[in-house]
Structures are given as C-alpha cells and as structure tokens.
Amino acid sequence: MALTIETDVLVVGTGPAGASAGALLARYGVRTMLINKYNWTAPTPRAHITNQRTMEILRDLGLEAEARLYAAPNDLMGENTICASLAGEEFGRIRTWGTDVRRRADYDECSPTSMCDLPQNYLEPILVKSAALDGCKVRFDTEYLGHEQDADGVSSRLRDRLNGEEFTVRSKYLIGADGANSRVVSDLDLPLEGTMGKSGSINLLFEADLDRYVAHRPSVLYWVIQPGSDIGGLGIGVVRMVRPWNKWLAIWGYDVEQGPPEISESFARRIVHNLIGDDSVPLKIEGISTWTVNDMYATRLQQGRVFCAGDAVHRHPPTNGLGSNTSIQDSFNLAWKIAMVLNGTADESLLDTYTIERAPIAKQVVCRANKSLEDFPPIAMALGLPQAKSADEMKSNMARRKEPGPEAQAQRTRLREAIAGTNYVYNAHGVEMNQRYDSPAIVADNSPDEVFRDVELYHQASTRPGAPMPHVWVYASGDGHRISTKDLCGKGNFTLFTGIGGAAWQDAAAAVSRQLGVAVTVRIIGPGQAYEDHYGDFARISEIIDTGAILVRPDFHVAYRATSLPADAAGDLVSAMRRILGRQSERSSALRVTSRAI
C-alpha cells in the first residue's frame, strides 16, 4: 500500500523562496514539509546581494547575526570597477550599494540593518536549519512529480530518489518554489509573459589569491571589457567576489543561438586568466556551469490551494541583485496569511491577496533587471568597442581617451556619463524598499497619492496604508537602549502603534482579540511609556498625532491608519481587521482546521 503523509503545507524547493517559506511557516507553528530533489542545498554561490528589506526578514526570524557571520559586509561591496583586466588599466569606478558618502545616510536612515553580500550557498542552509529546528520536516533527494487538488486539500505525488519509491503527501496547501524551470508552474499552467533564454552566460567558480589586485578597491563586482566580452551573457565580462579575496566567480558570455559551448578546464583557466590579466596567478577551477538571461514573469501566482514563489514566477538576470531578495519577500507575504487561515483567524479569501500584492512586484523586478542590462552598452560604445573590426583596433579605440585634444576629451566625457548611467543598476534603493501594496488586505485611508522624489532611486518612508512601516529608533524607558520600530512589530503578529494620547487603542485591540480571536500588540510611544521618542523621529515620520494609530501586518506593511482618534476606535479597528482578514461575512468559521496557534 502506497505511503501517504499528511501535513498542513508542502513546500517544493529549498532555494531562497522555499527555504524562507519553510522557516517562516514553521516559526508560525504551521505543520510544514520542505522537499528538495537534490541531496543538499545550492552547491554554488548564485544569488548574493542581500538588501535591507531581506535582512529585516532574517532579523525577524532571529537569523541576522548568523547570516552576517557568512556575509561580506557592506563596506567591502562598493568600489565597482570597470577595467581591461584586474591587473590592467581601469576605465572608471562607481560607488555602489549605498557606499557613496552622498547616499550612505539614505541607507542608514531607512532600516535597522545594512545590506551585505551573502552567497546563496551560505544563505540556504541557514534558512533550512531554522525551519528544521522549528519543526519543519525537511527531506532531500525527494522529487515532486505532480499534484491534484480538491476543495479540502492537495495530494502531491513524490519520489524518494534514494530508493525509487513513490508516495503521496496530503496537504492543505502546496507552495511551488522550484525555480525558473518550475514543474509546479507548468502543472498549473500559470500565465507567463516575456521571453526565456535571451542570451547565454558561463559561470566559472574558482579559487585564487587576488588580494594584491583588489583589496585596495574592495568590491563585489569587477567589470572587465576585453575582446569578446560583449558576446552574449550580460554583455560584459565579470569577476565576482565570493569570499574576500580568494574565492571568485567569473562570468563570460556565449552566443545563445549556437547553444552552450563545451567548456574544458583549460578553456576555463584561459578565460579566468584573461580576466585577471596575469597568467602567473595560481588558480583552481571549482565549478563550470551555464545559464541564460531571462525576461519573464507570471501574472497570476496561485491557483486554488497551490501557490508559486521565487524564480518560478519572476525570471530575470542578476542585475540589481533582486532575485533572492524578491523570492524571500514573496514568502514573507504569503506565510503569515496561510498561518492565519489555518488557525481559523482569517478567511481563505485573504490568500487571494498574495497574487494581488506580489504579481506587480514580480513584473517590476523583471522589468528593472532587464532594463539595467541596457545600461552597460553605452560604456562599450564610449570606448569604441562596437566600431572596432579587430582586437587591435579595439585596443586603439580604448587608448584614444588618454590623448590630449577635444576628440579625446569628448570620449572621456562620454565614458564618465556612461559609467554614471549605471547608477540605477547599483543604487536603486527605491526599487528595493518602496514596495507598496493595494489589496483587500489593506484599508485605504483616502490620503493623497504619494509624490516620489525618484521612486526607483530613493527610499521614501510613509505610513500610508500599503507602505512598509518606517524604521526609526525609539528608546526603552527602563534602560534607555534604542530599538527599531521594525523590531517592535512582526514575529507573525499584528502590531498597533500609537502615541501617548492613544490609550483608547488598547481597548480597541482588546475588542479585536475578544471578537475575532486575533492578538494585536499595542506599542505606545511617548514620555513615560515603555518606549520614548527622544529625538522626535517617530512623531516626525508617523504622520499621525498622539491619538492616532498605525496597524502593521506581520509582514511589516501598514494595513490601517487613523491619523487621530475616531469616535469609535474599537468599532473602527474591528471593522478594519475584519476587512484585512476577509471576515466581513464571518465565513471563516467554517474554515477552522486543527493547527497550532500562530
């Protein structure tokens, strides 16, 4: 008789989306099984840029300190260099990831965390371990074969790749986080827009001590312009730091029309030595793989009881470093909703807001990452590469900028402008931090639309419903230690911020608990309260007066705001929470299932 295992949620894939979904669901008390058809997590670095929003999620899980043990800090990320080779001449640099003194305050002001470089092969085990420690059942060598769903759940067919036996997992919900070639997406036939395989890239993982070439200009990425560097891939050669300064990933392109080439170790060594510019450097090739640049996103992320997340639904090049970040943020949006539906405090209609909120983000990041590819050709154009008919002519065109005279001066100007034009590739802080949601799980307050300085380049704090709760430091009244407003919310719970005149909101939160069974943590900020606003930053950024309130969802997004105390605070808050949870008609009473409370 075939084995059947029961669980609340089955997650397919242990990449950033799947591993974070497993960790979050387990933390929220949901019975979860996490599977991977391979024998361990990602063996190669893959994604690596880890932005502040993602670090906030790791912080919410209590994993920030562990993540930083394996990450290169922000200070080592910023001297992005464009050069002929690491040992050769430079064409220019651009300060990146907020390391420019003119941008650092923007980054420091918006989050209690800083971004870092955390390769995927170090990140995934942290998340998987967290999931397992919180009770998630983790199985490797377990392949997803297909599923059938009905009104009560999902039956997924799996294969144990160690013994070849097939078995069934019966779950309330299924999450497909199985990458850009997602079988779950294919089974659901989710609508996809865009193009796959636009160009081809070669990844060469290698060890080499390159300290003397890079330690004085620390960066994550070194962009190398050489003959052939404009063919396929990203349109430019790359040497990426994996571990400073002895583990690296070289990226070179290939013509996708001709298919991936056969890459011998000697060929790989030649590419790497050319990028370094010094054949005498000892090196060890540790891995060779190919991949393609994609431009595709799903317009619907779910069907019935099955959801898809991560690269399965947004497939794009690594420019802007959005891949693993967006994947983890997908799971942060979805996990609390599933948990609250399973424990009976939310209606299943809440789950529909996953697509409503995250599909626009999927489109945004795919479009931004592909648009960023267009920012590199002007550098090659300024150096005269496309015009050259031979390697010698290419070198001559590049050298011309070192001459005196108006022609060379014009070339230098074009080059500086072209390099500066990559600013939206590296410092698009708004793309990372300005995500806004508009769905039934957000109670609009009819405030005017925000006017952004530059929605892609600069973070803009707001407590307008749908925006992420802003970070400011407040101070514990007992010992005076600072704590972020972000640290006062999350952890799978709703949080209500108010001022010293908002004591009535405590009664309102109690009414929500009494009538809806949902706990709301109340944070009163003000003199003599548990948390004080010594610098006035909370008063400045909250956009409410002392009697108003800001309701924050478990995923840090503002769900409801009252700029002042309404006549019936309890009635208003209960009504808002009913809408957020989809319980206007109280249909959820029929949906209660056995699960540990969130």
Swiss-Prot record:
FAD binds at residues 8-37, 301-311. GO terms for molecular function: 2,4-dichlorophenol 6-monooxygenase activity; FAD binding. It catalyses: 2,4-dichlorophenol + NADPH + O2 + H(+) = 3,5-dichlorocatechol + NADP(+) + H2O. Pathway: Xenobiotic degradation; (2,4-dichlorophenoxy)acetate degradation. One of its GO terms (biological process) is 2,4-dichlorophenoxyacetic acid catabolic process. Belongs to the PheA/TfdB FAD monooxygenase family. Homotetramer. Transforms 2,4-dichlorophenol (2,4-DCP) into 3,5-dichlorocatechol. This is 2,4-dichlorophenol 6-monooxygenase. It comes from Cupriavidus pinatubonensis (strain JMP 134 / LMG 1197).
